[in-house]
Amino acid sequence: MSEKLQVVTLLGSLRKGSFNGMVARTLPKIAPASMEVNALPSIADIPLYDADVQQEDGFPATVEALAEQIRQADGVVIVTPEYNYSVPGGLKNAIDWLSRLPDQPLAGKPVLIQTSSMGVIGGARCQYHLRQILVFLDAMVMNKPEFMGGVIQNKVDPQTGEVIDQGTLDHLT
């Protein structure tokens, strides 16, 4: 019997009641038996990228730890909202820090992007921008399956913090 595929989720939202957080927390429960899905630490504690700080102080411990967990994983699922037609600032900041590391954690790594929003197109514009960023970092961005969860607020249970809409669950699996 082979080892389970190790996949980590990177949440692009900092909000406590994040719908994307609910999607991310649902993934380990619906993953196939051959896959283990674990959440990466929150990106909330990563300071704003500053090349002067990097040169003087090196990389923050939060960035080093995040990078190591990504390196150890077989793949990454980025679960994120769309802010102002693009990538949330916190997620872009985390990626900016990761991109400066000499041993690139995302290079050659399979990455799947999942976006959700309260609007009907489910974060599609964010996906396009995020793909451009990740391709530059030599990540192996998966073209399919695409998940853009539109009107996500109607597909989750805010009490349990999980996706409850069967069509959405089917699409996620």
PLM features: residue spans?
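Helix-loop-strand module that forms the ligand-binding subsite of alpha/beta enzymes
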Residues: 58-138
